[in-house]
Amino acid sequence: VGLEVRSVSLRGSFNNWAELPMQKQDNGTWSVSVELEPGVVQYKFFINGQWPKNMCDDPTFGTPQVDAEAQGCVDDGYGGFNAFREIQPQASQPPQDAAVELDFTHDPTAVRFVSVAAGRLSVRFEAKAGTVKEAFLEAGERYPMHLQLSYGELEVWRVAVSPSLGEYRIRVRDSSGREHSFGPFSPPQRPFAALDWVGRQVGYQIFLERFWNGDPSNDEKALATDEYNFNQAWNKDPGAPKPFLSRWSDPPAGDHCCHQYYGGDLAGFLQKLPYLQEQGVSLVYFNPLFDSGSAHGYDTHDYLQVSPKFGDKALLRKALDEAHKRGIRVLFDFVPNHTGLGFFAFQDVLKRGPASPYWNWYFIKKWPFVPGDATAYEAWGGFGSLPKLNTGNPGVRRYLIEVSKYWLRFGFDGIRVDVVNELIDAHGFFAQWRRELKALKPEAYLVAEIWQRDPSWLQGDEFDSLMNYAIGRDVVLRYARGGALFSGSRMLAELARVYATYAEAVAAMGFNLIGSHDTARILTDLGGGGLRDTPSAEALGRVRLAAAVLYALPGVPVFFQGDECGFGGEKPSSPPYDLHRYPVQWERCKPELQAHFKQLALLRKELPALTSPVLRTYKGEASVMAFLRGEAGEGEVLAVFNNSTDPARLELPPGAWRDALEARTYRGELELPSLGWRYLVRMGSAQR
């Protein structure tokens, strides 16, 4: 970027963000060596006494990426983004000296090596790339294992067998012809198993207040329940703006994020259900529906009541029933880390102080206090409207678990949980939460808001999936942007790294998204401009490419309302905030883009391989990237993508491949157009 770099230090979560000076090398780069414990590490470079705002895209210190070796970026909580890397444990050493060169790693108690998906037991091992010629799982019978994933210096080999598998060995013939035997191993008695229904779904996120106003008669109720009525640090200020109502197409005002209401409601959702079904949607994730003090709903006033601005319980039950009749399952958004000011326990603490039985539900620093004063109690993000709950308190835990059970009994099919890593004793709480919820409703789908790749939440005892920004934003979005820094080969390696880290059961249930209510819109991220801009044909093409990649991955593709319409929307750092949440202007939808999303959903129904839990890397060259979906053999799908505006070619695997969209068969080579993609279906058996 032409900047004269005078000093660089490394600061991160591994050293409590203390300074670790880096040294300038002869080639002009800066480096430092540090020994780290296994796990996910967040960090930034401190350059010339300044922090880069975004380690993945900073015009001052390096664009598109300050550290080209970073595996992705995650929100730093201050309007910027930290880079992160996952530090892998050292590979276990096999007992035989001759096998050391393999770096063979397999542990049947680790879910990434053994889990159940699609009714089969997946058994995998890792080895150094290029060292394994063939491998077999032996358990009375001999089952060939096949190369599944390749990235960096590692490979993953895999086989799927009956879940009734008993004791087994893994035999490997290395590249020199030597044979090695590992084991015996015993699979876990109750391996982590995927919910079979999840991976067949097509997801859609609904921010209800901005989805559609089906009943204007309830609009005024938003003002009656708004935070303003409880926040004395706000409502005692005569010059402060008040919450207000807007017409559906009114421009965003300064408090667009939170207290400008447009009237979206459950009646509007019911009116749009036929549209969702036509688009192929079969899973809806609602942002918070319960009584709260804002448009976003993350400041809960009553966990057991529907927000009056949306409707009531009777209307919610009708909405769930009608969705289920159309084959659409529904998740609700749960906020256990903090409440709003109107929550009964907080109001009791406000009035009674230490005498309140709920005093220890919060972290009160002084009393009496003014509600809304963030210096008086711990609050999420320092916002006085969001007092933090003490989830280490047994009473708080019991309340939150019973709330979750109540809504599952009511008819919801699963739960998305907000900021799970910020709870007190989070892992302990969610282990108990999962046990009780799965005992009540074993098929409930449990999703955690974690932005980076972090398998610690996905060991079979807490969550079924994370919100996979680590796939959607850190991999798919960066590939869809194009450019040499995120080539097809890098895209494929990053995908392989993710799927090697996670159990196959986790891959099968992946909640895969690129954008949401917390990010800029996909079109904006791909160069399509902001809320009122007219996007270029290239930007729309990149959206189509990103969607085609996401729909081809294991798990559930999830898009934010209106993404299929081709809407832009920024996430600015100054008012008006959260333009990506502007109401969906349905009359401005782009029919050709809606047709694209509908087509992708139809292909997932028509091609069983696209809903398989299995992804196998094939090839990445320059702008082209290709992976295989499903078990090898007739019907497997080769998904091929080109992120360049120039045409590109790819050598195909042996055999005949039928284009899923066109009546055409390919052999030998495929030419892809600008920003093109293809799903090719194998005709006949695979040739190994």
Question: Which residue ranges define each predicted feature?
Answer:
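Non-catalytic, glycine-rich low-complexity segments
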Residues: G77-G130, A193-D196, Q205-F207
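Active-site clefts of carbohydrate-active enzymes
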Residues: V506-P535
